[in-house]
Amino acid sequence: MEEYDVVIAGGSISGLMSAREIAKKGHSVLVLEEGFEIGTPDHCGGLVSKSALHELGIEPTQKTFDSMINSALIYAPSGKSIEINSKKQKVIVVNRRELDKQVALQAQQSGAEIRVKTGFKEKTKRGIK
């Protein structure tokens, strides 16, 4: 039976980033993703601040970067609206499927193992099933 220091259930962005950081510290990490592919299905709209990505150690590539948003017009149910403009804080639209794959690659390069089409049913005293 294979043994790992850490087993992470779910290959979402948070699971993959956790795997990346834990593996960087020298621990053996296994990520179990029940889906057939990392990044599917898409669970988020993909709007993130450029500074947040930078802080998390993610630099968008040409595949992950879709566009940049400098302003937004938000409508309330009453019909009133507010416009938000930003010269400092940039919000970018990312392709979440590709972003997840980019972070998965970073996790693997840090030493984590990722298994797709693999879930687990329960935690036991001897491990997981």
Residue ranges and their predicted role:
Residues 1-14:
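Beta1/beta-strand and adjacent pyrophosphate-binding region of the FAD-binding site
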Residues 7-9, 20-43:
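Glycine-rich FAD pyrophosphate-binding loop
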Residues 9-12, 34, 95, 116:
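A secondary-structure boundary/capping signal
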Residues 2, 67-70, 116, 126:
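Short, basic and Ser/Thr-rich N-terminal targeting/leader segments
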